[in-house]
Amino acid sequence: METRRSFIRKSVIIGAAICLPAAVGRESLAAYPDLKTRNPKKALVLWYSQTGQTSRYARLIACILKDRGIAVDVRDMQEFDKNGLASYDLIIVGTPTFYYDTPDNVRDWLQTIPLIPGTPVAAFVSFGGPEGNQHNAATHIIKLLLEKGGVPVGRDAFRNIASYPTPKWNTANQISGQHLPNAATFDQVRRFAADVLERITRGQAIAVGYEMALREGLRVLPLIWLNKKLISKHTVDAAKCIDCQTCVKKCPTKAINPSRQTVDRDKCLACFGCLNNCPADAVVMEYRGERLYGFPEYLRRNKIVILEPPEFKACNM
């Protein structure tokens, strides 16, 4: 049976004709405003996370900054008051890569933030497999922050176990990434945080440009709409639902209503946050008639325990 990913990949042929011109943009360093500080005292690490992967990296970054003597707030983007952004000397934004891009809800949120002139900014993305256009997804975040006056000082992408649900959870990416994140991943995160601080101290920004990537062309296609067409059922099992409201909290568009067992298909972003976080396996989703199950159940069935960085033993972020 064709998987969602194989269906989407067939669209590469269409996107390839569009992607090449999209990958050449690069900002001139001279176009950036001056950094408002070379000695940040207060930093904000914002994250959007569905299965805990991105928030894990965000917390590790926050621990590293805290260890350097910086006052750090690490917050869920969906719960943060954007009017407070101007009070920070450094802003780092982290998000998963969805459909080869920055998630729509993250993009919409960043487009409405107030100006942050001269504030050092950095971005990172988490991803579950190679060829996910992760460099460009992180670049899209940087571009949005640039539009608000931010000065880019860092960008990176960190791989972890894939959490994009498939009927059998046995795609090549899911199998090859079952051991991630590992110690090397956390070392990469540490280097990212250290490099960000070093660039700020030097007053050095990074050049922001896109990579040549076939997946970049797919951004112009209605991938979410196409994927939802292949999801034949999306509801809530009233007999299993424990009314914990986890699905509502995790849904970025509040499309799900567990008390009514309904999902607003027009508002749904097909992010699988409801399925991947329901503790009672009450979210029912079928792909072309085949039942999906969520990330926690996948970990349980395969006896997978995700590694935590050692910093978390002493750092409470």
Regions found by a protein language model. Name each.
Residues 1-18:
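N-terminal secretory signal peptides and thylakoid transit peptides that target proteins
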Residues 22-50, 56-63, 67, 72-74:
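C-terminal segment of N-terminal export signals and the immediately downstream linker at the start
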Residues 27-31, 270-317:
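Flanking helices and flexible, charged tails adjoining ferredoxin-like Fe-S electron-transfer domains
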Residues 34, 77-160, 272:
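Helix-loop-strand module that forms the ligand-binding subsite of alpha/beta enzymes
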Residues 54-58, 62, 106, 134, ...:
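Short, highly selective alpha-helical patches that border small-molecule cofactor pockets
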Residues 162-212:
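Glycine-rich phosphate/pyrophosphate-binding loop and the adjoining helix
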Residues 214-242, 249:
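A mid-sequence, solvent-exposed acidic-amphipathic segment
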Residues 236, 242-269, 273-291:
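Iron-sulfur cluster-binding cysteine motifs and their immediate structural context
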